[in-house]
Structure formats: C-alpha cells, structure tokens
A protein has these predicted regions:
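Charged catalytic cores and adjacent phosphate/nucleic-acid-binding surfaces used
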Residues: 1-7, 11, 21, 154-155, ...
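Divalent metal-dependent hydrolysis catalytic cores, especially in the metallo-beta-lactamase
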Residues: 7-10, 24-53, 77-84, 110, ...
Length: 259
C-alpha cells in the first residue's frame, strides 16, 4: 500500500530531529510523494521546553524559511507549512491566532499542561480521559482535522483499561463528528515492544484503539519523520498494518479533503 503524502514531518528546530529542511523535501520527492507537510512542534508563550519544541524566537524564521522552500520546490512537490499543536484551554486564543499564519495544524498531544507533565512518562486513567478531551476540544474549535498518534498515551502506562476504551471512543467519535483523520503513526516502532499486562506490544500503533474505528472514520499514515531517510522506509506501513490487524480501514486518499 502506498500513500502519496506525508504531513507529519519535523525539523531540527524541535531539538530532537536531524537533517536539513531541504533533505526532507528531497527524500519525499525520491519516495514519490506529491505532498510533504512540515509540522514543527508548537511553542507556547513564556515557556520553553528545549528538547521537545521549537523556541518561540525561532517561529518567524521557521515560517519564513518554509514558505520560501514551498515556492522553490513548487514545480516538483507541494510543500505545506504547519505546526503540530497540543491543546490547552488557556492557550486557545494563541492557537487560533497561529492557525492564521500557517497552511494547517495537526494535533499530537504529548503533555497534560502546556509547561509539562508528559503523558509518555506516566499517565493514569484520569490523565487518559483528559488527553482524549484535549483532542476533542481542538477538533471542536476547528484548529485541525488531523489527529497524530491518537494512541500515544500507551507509552506512559502498562495496561489497557476501561478508561482507555472510553478515551478511544471520545477520540473516534470526535474525529467522526468533525471529519478528522486518525493517524496510523509509523514512528512508534522505534520504541520497540513494551511489557504490558496483556503481553508485549508496541505502544503505538496500538490495536485496541483501532478496534473502535468504524467505516465512518478515515485513517492515514504519518511518518512522524525526525530524520529525512525515514520518508523512504515504506516497509513501516506493512509492519503497522500487521500490528493493527484490520483490513477494513477507510484510508484518506486526498490529504486536501481535511486542509
């Protein structure tokens, strides 16, 4: 199975990716993609998390550089300029303002609070439900129609509980209601299989979440690229589909449906 776009791509500005901006574009062209979208981790005013997000002071340069590259490569590939956001109610106005400065946003919730509390370090059932409602709220406000790694919370826990089912239903129903696509993240494989009470499994993609999807939900692959050559690793798709073990998923063929 092949997908001709990827809009989950990072740059060195998040401080945990490598490679020049143009190397990601050239890799996408070599992979036969028609669209490559950059979605750098959003910074929030008055707080910096250096290992996780772009600096506030780098945002203008990021946008200027990416829009220049969009123009430079327009005859070879479509380049989209965006951000990977996390939703916090007290940052709503800021996020709505930033949405006007870019082509698109995706939501990839990593923290409970805008200044920390990593869901991937540890999360309890209350945290999981908060995670789901943060995603739901971002979709409700129209900030995005793309949910990155909806199963990310499984990095910070070792059991799939009824609260996880409840959270999955919230996310899946919100995606359905607001016509959002759910991402099958191709980068979770890097963590390897983890020990869960139910047995060893990858944190994400996690099969339990995808059991909740219906034919009304659409999915896509997200390379979540932090290295240019990742965009050439098409074999990740087959591996992740084997993990999910569903052959009736509805794939989003045209990314412009949600932009």
């Amino acid at each position: 199975m092949k997908q001709n776009y990827n809009i989950h791509t990072h740059t060195t500005r998040c401080h945990h990716a490598v490679g020049r901006d143009e190397q990601y574009i050239l890799a996408a062209i070599e992979a036969g993609m028609k669209t490559i979208g950059f979605s750098e981790h959003m910074a929030y005013p008055n707080v910096e998390i250096p290992a996780e997000r772009i600096y506030n002071s780098d945002i203008d340069e990021y946008l200027d550089t990416m829009y220049a590259l969009k123009e430079k490569y327009k005859d070879q590939i479509e380049v989209l300029v965006g951000f990977e956001i996390e939703y916090y109610e007290d940052q709503k106005d800021y996020l709505l303002k930033m949405k006007e400065r870019c082509d698109y946003m995706i939501i990839g919730q990593h923290f409970r609070y805008y200044d920390g509390y990593n869901y991937d370090y540890f999360n309890n059932d209350e945290d999981v439900l908060m995670y789901a409602h943060q995603i739901e709220r971002a979709l409700e406000l129209g900030l995005t129609k793309y949910v990155a790694h909806p199963d990310y919370f499984m990095l910070g826990r070792r059991e799939w509980t009824p609260a996880c089912d409840q959270a999955a239903k919230v996310i899946v129903e919100a995606a359905k209601k607001y016509n959002a696509v759910l991402e099958i993240n191709l980068n979770g494989l890097r963590y390897g299989k983890l020990y869960y009470n139910e047995g060893m499994s990858y944190a994400y993609p996690h099969p339990e979440l995808f059991k909740h999807l219906t034919q009304e939900n659409k999915v896509c692959f997200g390379y979540d690229a932090h290295h240019p050559a990742t965009l050439l690793e098409e074999n990740r798709i087959a591996i992740c589909l084997d993990i999910i073990q569903r052959d009736d998923l509805v794939f989003l063929e045209d990314i412009h449906e949600i932009l």
